[in-house]
């Protein structure tokens, strides 16, 4: 077939060259955005008198027909037409005649594709924000049910201090809240229109960029036409934000994987989110958590890939920019899927409160309580730290724990020890007393839950 841009050429490309250069296999995902952008563009052309109202109406009817066909997956795309833009224009001309060729007046594929991607990401980021909020509501629900569930808190994956399981869960709530904030802030840069920037220098036609931007729901326009068609920082920002979100999901999944093991037994995954072994009948594998952890690297790769594509590109458009889409599409699909799986996995998991409680009674995670006890009685903390270190050494040599040490032994270490010491050694009391702002104390957790509910109330309402 003859190309819509073929006037300059005397030879046709080989079929394999066409296939190599075509992007329709993946950019057809922009079909709805491409048609909606074209409807806004031709509406603006008619308003400005660049095309007649009759021509615009005919073009819009043709585009609306194609949009309905697209929604029903009835459009058939061809590699010969290269990309989504030329495929739609070709179909439009076939449907309404040569007047369809006027659609591209005052526009280039360069600003057209940028517009499509802005529209696409605006919609998808809003979906991801909503899905993240839904995951946060699951975290709130689990935290409410586990305020007084005591577990070890860890540093270096070694038991450190007793904490509330709700406190641990809410740590991820606040990480996700920052992810939501980053996505929301990015919408300010996504929600601007490149349409009308042309190939790179604008156009000689008296277009109204603000009007077409308004029709598409954008908050403004790019101020520089070169910038509008050549940068993909809005996609990079999306990929970066998604990488951080996936990092948070991956860290949580790593803990869920550990906690579901026989060595921990803190939780059990629902059968819906686990698989078995083809050879070992006893196995229950946390495959969904492992997949989320694994897919995090995939999202990182999409970010690094586009950064590498962009780093050496001169202004303005270069064909390299065709490589901006597949990673974006893949990241959207990956993030949406991971958020959905994560919410279901956390909602259906069983928490083994007894095992968590046992883990903080047969260890030394209450050692800091003794140091604080001595410091509260006026002993410098560093001296208190040394005394408790000797006590822990004594216990490990005797094969006992701090609760097993008789008061006489404590008094040999320091005369400041009294009978009330054993109260502070209780893991429950240790957690309860940590009532500083943002701490693991039960009252602080209740305060944090109220704030968290306030941030997710719209999701709960819907």
Swiss-Prot record:
GO terms for cellular component: cytosol. It is found in: Cytoplasm. GO terms for biological process: arginine biosynthetic process via ornithine; L-arginine biosynthetic process. InterPro entries: Arg_succ_lyase_C, Argininosuccinate_lyase, Fumarase/histidase_N, Fumarate_lyase_CS, Fumarate_lyase_fam, Fumarate_lyase_N, L-Aspartase-like. Pathway: Amino-acid biosynthesis; L-arginine biosynthesis; L-arginine from L-ornithine and carbamoyl phosphate: step 3/3. GO terms for molecular function: argininosuccinate lyase activity. It catalyses: 2-(N(omega)-L-arginino)succinate = fumarate + L-arginine. Keywords: Amino-acid biosynthesis, Arginine biosynthesis, Cytoplasm, Lyase. Its EC number is 4.3.2.1. Gene3D superfamilies: Fumarase/aspartase (C-terminal domain), Fumarase/aspartase (Central domain), Fumarase/aspartase (N-terminal domain). PANTHER family: ARGININOSUCCINATE LYASE. Belongs to the lyase 1 family. Argininosuccinate lyase subfamily. HAMAP family: Arg_succ_lyase. This is Argininosuccinate lyase. It comes from Bacillus cereus (strain G9842). The gene is argH.
């Amino acid at each position: 077939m003859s190309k819509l841009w073929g006037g300059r050429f005397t030879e046709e490309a080989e079929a394999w060259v066409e296939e190599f250069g075509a992007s329709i296999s993946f950019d057809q995902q922009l079909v709805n955005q491409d048609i909606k952008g074209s409807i806004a563009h031709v509406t603006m052309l008619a308003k400005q008198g660049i095309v007649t109202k009759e021509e615009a109406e005919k073009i819009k009817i043709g585009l609306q027909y194609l949009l309905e066909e697209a929604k029903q997956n009835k459009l058939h795309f061809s590699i010969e037409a290269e990309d989504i833009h030329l495929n739609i224009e070709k179909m439009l001309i076939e449907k309404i005649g040569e007047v369809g060729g006027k659609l591209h007046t005052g526009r280039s594929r360069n600003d057209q594709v940028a517009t499509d991607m802005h529209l696409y990401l605006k919609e998808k980021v809003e979906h991801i924000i909503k899905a993240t909020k839904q995951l946060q509501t699951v975290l709130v629900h689990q935290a409410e049910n586990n305020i007084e569930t005591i577990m070890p808190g860890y540093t270096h994956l070694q038991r450190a201090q007793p904490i509330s399981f709700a406190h641990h869960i809410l740590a991820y709530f606040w990480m996700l809240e920052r992810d939501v904030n980053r996505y929301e802030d990015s919408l300010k840069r996504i929600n601007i229109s490149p349409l009308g920037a042309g190939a790179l220098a604008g156009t000689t036609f008296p277009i109204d960029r603000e009007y077409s931007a308004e029709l598409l729901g954008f908050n403004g326009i790019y101020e520089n036409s070169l910038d509008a068609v050549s940068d993909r920082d809005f996609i990079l920002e999306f990929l970066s934000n998604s990488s951080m979100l996936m990092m948070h999901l991956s860290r949580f999944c790593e803990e869920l994987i550990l906690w579901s093991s026989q060595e921990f037994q803190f939780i059990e995954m629902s059968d819906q989110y686990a698989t078995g072994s083809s050879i070992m009948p006893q196995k229950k594998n946390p495959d969904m958590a492992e997949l989320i952890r694994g897919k995090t690297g995939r999202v990182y790769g999409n970010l690094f890939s586009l950064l590498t594509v962009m780093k050496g590109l001169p202004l303005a458009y270069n064909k390299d920019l065709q490589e901006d889409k597949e990673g974006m599409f893949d990241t959207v699909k990956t993030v949406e899927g991971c958020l959905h799986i994560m919410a279901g996995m956390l909602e259906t998991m069983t928490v083994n409160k007894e095992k968590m409680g046992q883990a903080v009674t047969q260890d030394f995670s209450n050692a800091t309580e003794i140091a604080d006890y001595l410091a509260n009685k006026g002993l410098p903390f560093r001296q208190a730290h040394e005394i408790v270190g000797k006590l822990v050494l004594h216990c490990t040599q005797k094969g006992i724990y701090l609760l097993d040490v008789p008061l006489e032994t404590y008094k040999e270490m320091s005369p400041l020890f009294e009978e009330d010491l054993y109260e502070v050694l209780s893991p429950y009391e240790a957690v309860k007393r940590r009532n500083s702002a943002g701490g693991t104390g039960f009252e602080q957790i209740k305060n944090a839950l109220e704030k968290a509910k306030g941030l997710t109330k719209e999701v709960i309402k819907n």
